[in-house]
């Protein structure tokens, strides 16, 4: 059965994730408040952050940074783009 949520990013009822993305209070907050669509968009944004900041995701510092950015992306005013980020040109 589909899990629906009122998506924090889109401010509307949407299909939710199949399971919490990680086992923590924050993971359950995402599960209960973030849609599949918004989560997929976060994954793409996270890839950009990893590449632009050359983060090593296994380090505690990178993990803290990504959780902070994720919190801003979904529940704050939106995650900031790196100052020198240039979006890829359309093909």
Swiss-Prot record:
The domain of life is Bacteria
A Gene Ontology cellular-component term: cytosol
Q: Which InterPro entries match?
A: Fe_traffick_prot_YggX, Fe_traffick_prot_YggX_sf
Its keywords, alphabetically, are: Iron
Pfam families membership: Iron_traffic
GO MF annotations in UniProt? iron ion binding
Q: Which Gene3D superfamilies match?
A: Fe(II) trafficking protein YggX
Alphabetical GO biological process terms: cellular response to oxidative stress
Give a yes or no for keyword Hydrolase in this entry.
Answer: no
Q: What does this protein do?
A: Could be a mediator in iron transactions between iron acquisition and iron-requiring processes, such as synthesis and/or repair of Fe-S clusters in biosynthetic enzymes.
Record-stated family:
Belongs to the Fe(2+)-trafficking protein family.
This protein is called Probable Fe(2+)-trafficking protein
- Native species: Acidobacterium capsulatum (strain ATCC 51196 / DSM 11244 / BCRC 80197 / JCM 7670 / NBRC 15755 / NCIMB 13165 / 161)
């Amino acid at each position: 059965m589909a899990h629906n949520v009122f998506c924090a990013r889109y401010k509307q009822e949407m299909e939710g994730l199949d399971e919490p993305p990680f086992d923590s209070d924050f993971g359950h907050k995402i599960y209960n408040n973030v849609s599949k669509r918004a989560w997929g968009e976060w994954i793409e944004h996270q890839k950009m952050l990893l590449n632009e900041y050359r983060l090593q995701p296994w380090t505690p510092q990178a993990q803290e940074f990504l959780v902070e950015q994720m919190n801003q992306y979904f529940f704050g005013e939106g995650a900031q783009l790196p100052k020198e980020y240039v979006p890829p040109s359309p093909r």
